């Protein structure tokens, strides 16, 4: 499977820097990496999607076309920008914003009906990991049971919560074992990404694992040259 790289800016990128970053990436991305790169700015960091060489996506959207949902971004907003790729289930939204499994299912089903490409994030906390691999498998299985694993526009991103933003990536052995388990559950055509303290120093080794189809990168993607270094390993 062709390997891909995704950048999640979270809420860390200044608005106009985000705009300049997108335009520079479009100009400088090498042909061998066309269509293998995805970028998820915050909503104000988005631009109307006229980019030809990479995919522009949204970090979040409310599962309605439009309406009285103060502060929310809806499918109509994204469609107006010609954006049809969306992150769902990121641990920061699960934990900080209390997005429940039932709400994540509602989001998934709604944007599936719109034929969006959905990047669905899963991952366990350290307390689960410390209970052993059986507990990890049960936890991840539960996170996936409410969505359609045969949806052809699905990408799954495994991000162990204890590795996100901690500068401590999961070990290569942990990634190998966990991705091997997830590959048994997922449709064979569904890309499976790793995320969690990915950077330019460890990306190449992680991409060397056969069951890793790409990377979801947070803070290491905020500087374009860092992100381009990671892209070069694809």
UniProtKB/Swiss-Prot annotation:
Keywords: Cytoplasm, Gluconeogenesis, Glycolysis, Isomerase. Substrate binds at residues 8-10, 165, 197. The active site is at 90 (electrophile), 159 (proton acceptor). It catalyses: D-glyceraldehyde 3-phosphate = dihydroxyacetone phosphate. GO terms for cellular component: cytosol. GO terms for molecular function: triose-phosphate isomerase activity. Pathway: Carbohydrate biosynthesis; gluconeogenesis; Carbohydrate degradation; glycolysis; D-glyceraldehyde 3-phosphate from glycerone phosphate: step 1/1. The keyword Metal-binding does not apply. InterPro entries: Aldolase_TIM, TIM_sf, TrioseP_Isoase_bac/euk, Triosephosphate_isomerase, Triosephosphate_isomerase_AS. Disulfide bonds: none annotated. Its EC number is 5.3.1.1. GO terms for biological process: gluconeogenesis; glyceraldehyde-3-phosphate biosynthetic process; glycerol catabolic process; glycolytic process. Involved in the gluconeogenesis. Catalyzes stereospecifically the conversion of dihydroxyacetone phosphate (DHAP) to D-glyceraldehyde-3-phosphate (G3P). NCBIfam families: PRK00042.3-2 (NF000728), PRK00042.3-3 (NF000729). Homodimer. Belongs to the triosephosphate isomerase family. This is Triosephosphate isomerase. It comes from Helicobacter pylori (strain Shi470). The gene is tpiA.
